[in-house]
Amino acid sequence: MNEDINVTFIIPPECRNENECSEEMQLAFTACEQHSGGGIKAQWQAQTTWKKFVGLTKKDVFVVSEFQGEFFERLRLVGPRCISCCLTEGISIPSGPEPVFTIAMRGLVVTASGLSKQQKENIKKKVHWMGGLYSTVLTEDTTHLVADTVLSDKYVKAVERNLPVMQDTWIEAVWESSLRLNINAASSDFDNHKLPPFANLQVTTTGITKKDKALVMKLVSENGGTFSGAFQSETTDIVVLNKDSIGSEKYKAALEYGKACVLPSWVIDSAARGVALPLSKYRVAGASTSSPLSEHRAPDMSLNFSRITNLRPPSNFVDESRAVDISTMSSRMKVSI
C-alpha cells in the first residue's frame, strides 16, 4: 500500500468506550494495529461525536458492529470480520459503493429466478454485504443462480453451463456462518442448499408399469416434487408416460393444456444428476413442446396459480384410476395464457 488507509472503528451509542465494544471489533482493531506502519492507521471514534460525513475518500474506512441505523445509512462501511479476514489473507479491503460485512461471497456473481421482488432485494443486499456481486440477468460472469423453480430460462441456461443452482436458504446460511467464521459461500459445506431437481413440480404418470410408477413417485418425492395420481390443469406440471401411452386421457389433457410429456428416464436421470435435465431428449413423440425445460421458452404461467382442493373434481381434472372421461372437459374451463 502506497498511501495510508484510515480505518475508524465506530463505538456504538450503547458503549461508553472501546473496551465495551464486541470482542470481534476489538480483535479487528488489534489486527489493524499489527499492520500500523504498513499502510493502515486505525483509531476508535464514538458514534455520538462523529460529525464528518463529507470530504471522505476511498482511503477512509469505517468499521461498525451492526449494519443498521442512521450512521450506517450515511456512510459506506465494512464490518470487523471483513477487516480481519482481509488482513489475515493479505487481500485488499473492499472499496465498492456497497457496505461489506464479510467476504464470504467475494468473487461470486449471483442472479435469481422465480422469487418475489422482496426476496430478490434481500438476496441482493446480503450478497453485497458478503462482498459478492448481484446481477438481474444471467451472464457469462454468473457463478450461481438462486431459484425456487426449474421452469425458467435462467435455470435451463444454468444447467447447460453447470452452474450451481441454490435455494434462497443458501444466502441466509452463508450469511449466518460468515458472521462467526471465515468461510467461502462456494464451499461444498453448503451443498445441502442446492435446489432439488423437481423443486415445486407436481408430477403425474399414465400408462407405465406399477414398478416404474412406484419409482417415479419415490424419486419425485425425495427430490423436492409432489406426485399426484390425477391430472389437473392448474397444478400438474409434468406427465410421465411411455411412448405407447399417447392415447391415454392424461396425455390428451396434457396436450390440450400445454404440459410437458416425458419418458420415465427423465425422472431417473434428473434425480441421478441432481438437476432437472432439459426435456428435448426425453419428450414423448408428438407431445407438447411448450415447456421451457425443453425449448427454453417462457414458463407456463399456470404454474403460479393457487392450488385449490375441490370437493368435486373440476372439469379440467383427469384421474384415470377413476375412469374420468376426458370429454367432460369444458372448453370454457381451459386456462388461457
Give each language-model segment a name.
Residues M1-I337:
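Eukaryotic intrinsically disordered, low-complexity regulatory regions
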